[in-house]
Amino acid sequence: LPSVAGTALHAMALAQFWPSAPPTRNRAVLVHSAAGGVGSMLVQMAKTLGCGPVVGVVGAPHKVEACKACGADAVVCKAGRRDWWDEVDAASPDGYAAIFDANGVATLRRSYDALAQTGRLVIFGFHTNLPTVSSTLSPWHWLRMAKGMASMPPFEPMDLVLSSKSIHGFNLSFFADETDLVDAYMAQLLAWVAAGQLRVA
């Protein structure tokens, strides 16, 4: 619970939906890898905090129902498709107030483009940049990672200002020095679990 749900709650805080959200018109949320550990938590938290529509993206057909069970208003399955972003755009024609992305180079630029004015892109991982092997990395794996790093999309500061968009990134290592923040997060998470608003299984 602490690492997975803590990651999700901090992402929601960076998106300004917790502990209290501003009364903005657009409260649409897009969650990548929405059937995974952090993603499923983000979907549940977004619904609990009054976001909507909450749109989840999954990578396989068998994950669609799991994402819906977490409360997603719409689920986009990208397996074997090149046009899945069209479905993402159609689910929230005015763009998204927040997009949560742990994919890395594969989706970052398009995620940024899908933000509404004042929208926030929250980045907490780069799993498409990493090799999917458990053994020693080969020279090919290192080359692939280098190519991914070189392909990272640039984000122009002037564009951030003109569009009123923002980008936030984090990893949990900073939690070690923020015990008060961790205590606040744990109190909220346990309250949601006790109220049946957050499923951790």
Where are the model-predicted features located?
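Terminal helix/beta-alpha structural elements that buttress the NAD(P)+-binding lobe
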Residues: 1-201
